[in-house]
Amino acid sequence: MSHGEEKEPGIPQKVDSIDEIFVGCKSWVLKDGQDRLAEILSINSRRDPPKFYVHYEDFNKRLDEWITADRLQIDKEVIFPRPKELEEKKDSKKKKQQQNKSATPQAASATPDGGDVMDLDNLNVQGIPNEDISREDEIKKLRTSGSMTQNQNEVARVRNLNKVIMGKYEIEPWYFSPYPIELTDEDVVYIDDFSLQYFGSKKQYERYRKKCTLRHPPGNEIYRDDYVSFFEIDGRKQRTWCRNLCLLSKLFLDHKTLYYDVDPFLFYCMTRRDELGHHIVGYFSKEKESADAYNVACILTLPQYQRMGYGRLLIEFSYELSKKEGKVGSPEKPLSDLGLLSYRAYWADTLIKLLVEHGQEITIDEVSSISSMTTTDILHTAKALEILRFYRGQHVLYLNSDVMKRYKKLKNNKRRSIDPQKLIWTPPVFTASQLRFAW
């Protein structure tokens, strides 16, 4: 569906009982003392009374939940989906219209060298394509990527685990993750803090914990300060551990869809140390060979450690690796909503600090070289900060009073940061056979 089109509304009807409601209907649901419209995504009739899995209209998917029947407001009209025959006719009509549209030749660009001109008003840092992609086209375009979004229909919409216990933390998952189906009937799933192995019962977990000797991610420790450590793990060498990490992260990342083939990736895990060992706080993955110059494929801070500044450390560390490699980089798009906010804040603070402390004229390319940020990300950030001006026939960066105030705040902020001197790392080099996917 294109952005300009509205989805056809359903058919509102009164119902006499809960039994008339099925998957695809929209009903009013009592949430936090208010009635909210929600779509029924799944019904669990194995339980008595049955439970309904709902998605609230205009709310993020992470708020989807299982509810009991008493929260459904059946005294109000229920919106039923339109009959399938009507939908199919409408879809075929749309397809014909799209085919006719694509057959119409497009007007030539008014700019002769359009490839060298950057449209500053339409910089798309989120990287989400605007056109619709059919299932067949999507499969053709599919590549082994850590965070590629697939069509909504291809991603399971029902969260399948209710609760996860990881170390001393009890966590409620946000999204579906393809754990073994036998775990989905368990009220609680136990995940080992070090090996990330999963268990359906506490007894199984405790027996495993007595035997397992792993106390840190199974890779090389490449960074350590008095606060955090970073480990580099090769997906090809540690497949089981990396797959477990991807399954865990899928619980909290909506558009992470490829989790099985970890061979083409390196994983950089941030940990906190205590007397028991290194506990994973967050991670980012990175393609061993990225054709698009991405320096991050997936990035996640586990929910129990969010809002503590760890996400920013992960982002900063990814750029420190890019500096060591002598490359510019950018995260793979699209970013999650939380990821985009974190990156925008990091880009803005980095750009402001660099411009103020440099103290003299500097080009965008020089800013890119020093920070390892791409010119697109720099321009997008400058535009968001409203410091990009057109002066005497060229674009210049103008430091206004708001930027100077933000810089003073940055200077007074005692935020933790990565110490480049403590990064003991040489960029890995891979042969063609090492980069080959192991199918």
Swiss-Prot record:
Where exactly are the zinc fingers annotated as C2HC MYST-type?
189-214
- Site description Important for catalytic activity, residues in chain: C298
Q: What is known about its processing and modification? A: Autoacetylation at Lys-256 is required for proper function.
EC number(s) from the headed UniProt entry: 2.3.1.48, 2.3.1.-
Q: Where in the cell is it found?
A: Nucleus; Chromosome
Which intervals of the chain are annotated as region Disordered? 83-120
Q: Which residues form the MYST-type HAT domain?
A: 156-427
Principal cellular location given in the protein's record = nucleus
Where is the PTM N6-acetyllysine found along the chain? K256
Could you tell me one molecular function GO term of this UniProt entry?
peptide 2-hydroxyisobutyryltransferase activity
Asked if the record carries the keyword Secreted, the reply is no
Q: Write the record's keywords in alphabetical order, separated by commas.
A: Acetylation, Activator, Chromatin regulator, Chromosome, DNA damage, DNA repair, Nucleus, Transcription, Transcription regulation, Transferase
Q: Which domain of life is it from?
A: Eukaryota
Q: Which residues bind acetyl-CoA?
A: A297, C298, I299, L300, T301, Q306, R307, M308, G309, Y310, G311, R312, S336
Give the family per the record.
Belongs to the MYST (SAS/MOZ) family.
The free-text function statement in the UniProt record for this protein reads: Catalytic component of the NuA4 histone acetyltransferase (HAT) complex which is involved in epigenetic transcriptional activation of selected genes principally by acetylation of nucleosomal histones H4, H3, H2B, H2A and H2A variant H2A.Z. Acetylates histone H4 to form H4K5ac, H4K8ac, H4K12ac and H4K16ac, histone H3 to form H3K14ac, and histone H2A to form H2AK4ac and H2AK7ac. The NuA4 complex is involved in the DNA damage response and is required for chromosome segregation. The NuA4 complex plays a direct role in repair of DNA double-strand breaks (DSBs) through homologous recombination.
**What information about domains appears in the record's comments?**
The ESA1-RPD3 motif is common to ESA1 and RPD3 and is required for ESA1 histone acetyl-transferase (HAT) activity and RPD3 histone deacetylase (HDAC) activity.
What protein name is recorded for this chain? Histone acetyltransferase ESA1
